[in-house]
Amino acid sequence: MKVVIVGGVAGGASAAARIRRLDEHAQIIMIERSGYVSYANCGLPYYVGGVIKEQAELTLQTSESFWDRFRIDVRVRQEVTAINPAEKTVTVHALDSGKVYTETYDKLLLAPGAKPTVPALSGVSSERVFTLRTVEDTLRIRRFVEEKKPKTAVLAGGGFIGLEMAENLAEMGVSATIVQRPKQLLAPLDADMASFVHAEIRRHGVTLRLGETVTGFRQDGDSVLTLLEGSEPLHSDMVLLAIGVTPDTHLAKEAGLRLGIRGSIAVNERMETSVPGIYAVGDAVEVTHFVTGQKALISLAGPANKQGRIAADNICGGNSRFHGSQGSSVLKLFGLTAASTGINEKAAQAAGIAYDKVVLFPASHAAYYPGAQSMAMKVLYEKESLRLLGVQIVGGEGVDKRIDVLATVIRAKMTALSLTELDLSYAPPYSSAKDPVNMAGFMIEDLESGKVRQFHWNDVEDLPCNGSATLLDVRTEWEYQRGHLDGFRNIPLDDLREHLDELDRGKPVYVNCQTGLRSYLACRLLTQYGFTCSHLSGGYSFYQVVTKEQQTARSAYPCGMEKL
């Protein structure tokens, strides 16, 4: 059997190695357009920033190491320019020599990945405007930074690459500005959870220009102007386009393969395309979202590697299946970790799923052990079935551990109530006896059993302030004096029993505390004394971060932009 693989990196390289493990006698040819067949593309921003010191550390395998270990014929700096499914051939252009030749195949695997989205704007070809996707891109940016020593940079786009580059540039002393049309960074997060990310970025000196549209670029001596719709241009020494990626599927389209959403390659669970004998994996293919069942584009290394393995199994006569991706991701940003899995509120609404949510602020480990850090945790679940839909966590240490546990719960199709039963490891330096994952389950259990009601940060402005309801803040007097919600009366939780006669049982009670715990306790107390009570999910802390970010964003917009 002769297998030709178009593209390396995650999907193609993992498939090549798997095919060899399954079939020692197969002829395997891997053709890669760049000069690097297998590299850590997720580490590229950290090489630019000097966190990863040596270029060699980015290289996972080379052409030589693939041959020595797997006897795989790797051809770098060669580009497949056409596929002929009827003849089972590909046309290859050797970029260095200019030679064009034809290669036959029995099985063909496409792993072309995705290319940076470069809008058709004036000035994008400037030598000071960069994209970051390959090792060559990284070397070009690193060389520019070392030689030109830029003081300012504009990043067009606020996805993973844009944020990681903003962090690395800021750590190098470069004044960075992120500009994008959406008013929120990190699309997998809901806007309220993204507020924590925005605040952290601003705290480290990165300027956010959200809700603004880039209309072009113009070279201005040793700087470049980023032109904005309705605003003054931004002057900087360099620009990085981090708008996103687009599936690189022109070969598949020209070969007559069926395409999916946004021009991606349509595949089945076996990673087979619409043409027999041709498989496809990685960022170029559409997948089924594990939670919604809808088609999606999820450009992540984990799914690409799994798809490569599955395609290899089936190329070698197996029957492996890819059952979809839930988009689990994690990001380091200065002192913060942001992670998500499954779907957010916007996606749940788009899919027509009736859901509820809880917000909590647990500590990373036992609070009495030094170094505990808080995290903001948002858990979505389906109302009818109680299945877990998605989780977002932003905080310090321990975020990655919890998101992986909850990603496993989603994959296992367990209910939100099952979180209460998870038997998780505990020692004071690592967790609490009631782990944050368990705590989320306890909160959902109380909600669903009717033991507590809740309202959310965006409900606060609609609360009745005409005396028809009791608005109660159960924090300490000191906390209350430092800041509180308008119209809320302060009765500390520990004093509440002594003040029950001052409250009208005929009025609904809305309770607030710092993070939601004491308000929950107050509601349980009040309910048992005949009051109808709801508490603020996430408490004053959550409300304050979200509303403060909204105010900061509004003040940053040019006049009228806040309405766009």
Describe each region flagged by the PLM.
Residues 6, 103-113, 156, 234-244, ...:
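Short hydrophobic core segments
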Residues 1, 284-397, 428-432, 436-462, ...:
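Mid-to-C-terminal Rossmann-like scaffold of FAD/NAD(P)H-dependent oxidoreductases
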Residues 110-172, 207, 267-269, 489-493, ...:
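Glycine-rich dinucleotide-binding loop and its adjacent helix/turn
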